[in-house]
Design a protein with these regions (language model features):
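An active-site-proximal structural segment forming one wall of the substrate-binding cleft
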Residues: 2-19, 23, 27-119, 136-149
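Extracellular glycoside hydrolase catalytic/binding regions
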Residues: 88, 95-116, 120-226
């Protein structure tokens, strides 16, 4: 393990300018951290800090290295389980999720290097698009996205896709988790500031999973369609 400053230095030296910083809803409510190596004086500034305070420190250090930050709600609980929806795991509700984003937007709106919110990592499974139901990701993204923009109007709002279950049907049978944006054509995400919206589908190569289109003889045209 390494010191966080050393890692930020390497990221900068490699020419990257933006970090997607994951967090869990549980961490933002916790008073203690775990998994940080303090051996040999590493990460001394993080000792005794809450997860929120650790985030503060890393964001400020990133700013000193001209690194931008996009916050990413990667999971609900600290177990890292990739639950399909943005709520409903480990007792967290949709209100908890929106309130967490509102709190983060309020806290970091004045930080010039915090530039965006990736609202939910890879919605999949029971997540739908454009149905208007409780599990409609488009509806939830509008709810949280507009809550963020009310506090941080200049942030980018990253909205990933889903996996399946698009209202009115979809052209392709299979998609990656977070990769299905077919529903956008008929049901786009509506934000209070339309120019802050970034559709952010997740796509992978065959090393992650041998999706059928990778072995299809018409792969070139399939990729063009995607």
């Amino acid at each position: 393990t390494r010191d966080y400053k050393d890692m930020l230095n390497q990221i900068s030296s490699l020419g990257f300018n933006t970090i997607r910083m994951p967090f869990s809803l549980q961490a933002m409510r916790s008073t203690t951290t775990s998994g940080i190596d303090y051996g040999g004086g590493k990460n001394a500034e993080l000792a005794g800090k809450t997860p929120q305070q650790v985030m503060d420190i890393i964001i400020d250090e990133a700013a000193r290295k001209n690194l931008m930050i996009i916050l990413d709600n990667h999971s609900q609980a600290d177990d890292g389980f990739m639950f399909d929806l943005w709520c409903g795991h480990a007792g967290f509700t949709e209100t908890d999720w929106v309130n967490t984003w509102t709190s983060l937007a309020t806290r970091y709106a004045s930080k010039p290097n915090v530039i965006g919110a990736d609202l939910k990592n890879e919605p999949h499974g029971s997540a739908t698009w454009g149905t208007g139901a409780a599990n409609d990701w488009r509806r939830a993204a509008e709810l949280a996205g507009n809550a963020v923009l009310a506090k941080a109007p200049n942030w980018l709002i990253l909205v990933e896709g889903i996996e399946g279950q698009v209202a009115g049907g979809q052209q392709l049978d299979r998609h990656w988790w977070g990769g299905n944006l077919e529903g956008v054509r008929d049901n786009p995400v509506r934000l209070s500031r339309a120019n802050r919206l970034v559709y952010s589908p997740h796509e992978y190569g065959p090393g992650v999973d041998a999706q059928p289109w990778f072995s299809d003889p018409n792969m070139a045209s399939i990729l063009a369609d995607r």
